[in-house]
């Protein structure tokens, strides 16, 4: 941005305080009301009233949350038991799952899912390999004559 004035420092060489009065009046944080968030409940309260949310005073007061690192977070891609029952025969014909002893063997990680939920119903016996399964999903698959085997997620 264009400066429309000359800096006074050029003309104040040798004056020790450069127009700021006594020594120390323009040093450190005393002239600005303190360092950082100091004084927001005292002499800087007008800033809180102007810029903070009414009632909470956010972002000047309160906890502000925590964002987990992406290496810890898992993006869940769930599939319901009912959906699995509908597509299991199609997946067998496509060669994406195999059959052992009259039961279909399904690895959800290979199909792009990492969680098994209990929505819907199933009447086909399946052996499901999954990192996470809900309690109802495990019960429904066991009632249909199958089983759920928990495997680790490789990141």
UniProtKB/Swiss-Prot annotation:
Gene Ontology MF: a single term: structural constituent of ribosome
Compositionally biased region (Basic residues): 1-16
Signal peptide region: none
Region of interest (Disordered), residue spans: 1-35
GO cellular component, one term: cytosolic large ribosomal subunit
Keyword tags: Ribonucleoprotein, Ribosomal protein, RNA-binding, rRNA-binding
Superkingdom: Archaea
One GO BP annotation of this record: translation
Keyword Zinc-finger: no
Subunit structure: Part of the 50S ribosomal subunit.
Protein purpose: Binds to the 23S rRNA.
Family (UniProt): Belongs to the universal ribosomal protein uL15 family.
Official protein name in the record: Large ribosomal subunit protein uL15
Origin species: Pyrobaculum arsenaticum (strain DSM 13514 / JCM 11321 / PZ6)
Taxonomic placement: Archaea, Thermoproteota, Thermoprotei, Thermoproteales, Thermoproteaceae
